[in-house]
Amino acid sequence: MQHWSKRSLSDTNKTLWCGWVIKSQNFQYFFVGDTGYSNDFTNIQKKFGPIDLASIPIGAYEPRWFMKDSHCNVEEAIQIHKDIKSKKSIAMHWGTFQLTDEPMDEPVQLLNKFSKKNNLTNKFIALQHGETIKI
């Protein structure tokens, strides 16, 4: 995972950003965290094996020249899903605040488009605000 942290003018990268894997005997959940794409995800998969459920960020990615290292775009999010061999992924980090230049609904529209293109319909989904699902 890659990002940066800052809460005031003088504390750049004094705290760490992260993702985490929660494991039980029969289930693994991966909270990817706030990140840009990197090859770290293939290493995570090698360490933990296939993931049962992942929360993967899909928003706040434009302009790419500025956001690429900190926020993955939808195609990169799909690559993370593939890299970690997630059985099911839920999109996060989109649609709450207008943080960047892409339209608020674009990440979900692109997720639906690229999920179909990659045969991931119902495997990588975006929930509407307040929506729940059974796992």
Describe the residue ranges of each PLM region:
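Core dinuclear metal-dependent hydrolase active-site scaffold
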Residues: M1-G49, K113, H129-I135
